[in-house]
Amino acid sequence: MKQIQDLTSIYARKKPAEFADNLCLFFCYNFCKGKIFKDEKEAFDAAEKARLDGFLGDDGFVLNAEAILREGNCFRWSVQKEKISAIGDVKKASPVCFEYNGRAHWVVVENGEIVFNSLENSVCVKNGKPVSMRIIRQLDL
């Protein structure tokens, strides 16, 4: 089965090609806050809204992680960057970046296992190494 990022590219034809290619961290943040898109149209519409709101760049890269996490709920969030070299110590669901040959892809890791990947097949995950993660904290309980 194709994953959500593979499918959203059909809606991105009028946008720069890299817009859909670079949405992996956006999808990871949504997964971490409990948002599961019902289909690729809903996912693309959410990404386009985030772009128009200034939370994503025209290239699909995340500009404001806290705002993406806050969208659709009343909580405030904190996101901290941390370098890593292995996923075994990642306990709480967190976006993790894998790099391979100058390319990067984000997945969600929990308890040392990948629990969400917006792509069906990622060369970065398959052949690359984890290099950084985002630690997400909900500030309002």
What are these regions (language model features)?
Residues 1, 140-141:
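Short intrinsically disordered terminal tails
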Residues 1-55:
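Active-site-adjacent structural segments surrounding the nucleophilic cysteine of cysteine proteases
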Residues 33-140:
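Conserved active-site-adjacent core of cysteine acyl-enzyme catalytic domains
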